[in-house]
Amino acid sequence: VFYIREVPHRHLPLLILAALLGATPAFAACTAPAAPEVNWRRCLLDGRDLTGVDLTRGHLRDASFQRARLGQAVMIGADATDARFLSADLTGADMTDANLRETDFTRATLREARLIRADLRRARLFRADLTGADLTGADLTGADFNGAILDGVRWTDGERICAAGSVGTCQ
């Protein structure tokens, strides 16, 4: 049982302000430099040049990287569930063992990307360019490859290589 005592009216605005500030999420981590295990959850990183950064085991859930440059980025074991990489350049990025469930890669460039054992369940790869990417052991359950370029992609079994001209499905 909680008892609330009457608060003098002069303290009421201060209490309301304290309650509002306590209820807002902390975004200070969004200014943290790129580093392994960085916490960029829900951060807006649209258009940033993050070429070659190490985001190993990074917390990237719900973050936005629209039109960002992440070529050669190391994102091994990162959690990017529900993140948005629309039109981002991830050429040669290493996302081995990454959690990419429901992540949106619409029109992203993932040429030569390593998505080995990545969890891509229900990911959106609409019109993405995955030329030469490695999907060995990846979970693609419910993933949308509509219009995706899959030339030379190493498929989930680690053996099959998609033929030139593969769009939407591995031929």
Regions found by a protein language model. Name each.
Residues 26-171:
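Tandem repeat scaffolds
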Residues 13-23:
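Bacterial N-terminal signal peptides
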Residues 3-14:
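Bacterial N-terminal signal peptides that target proteins for export
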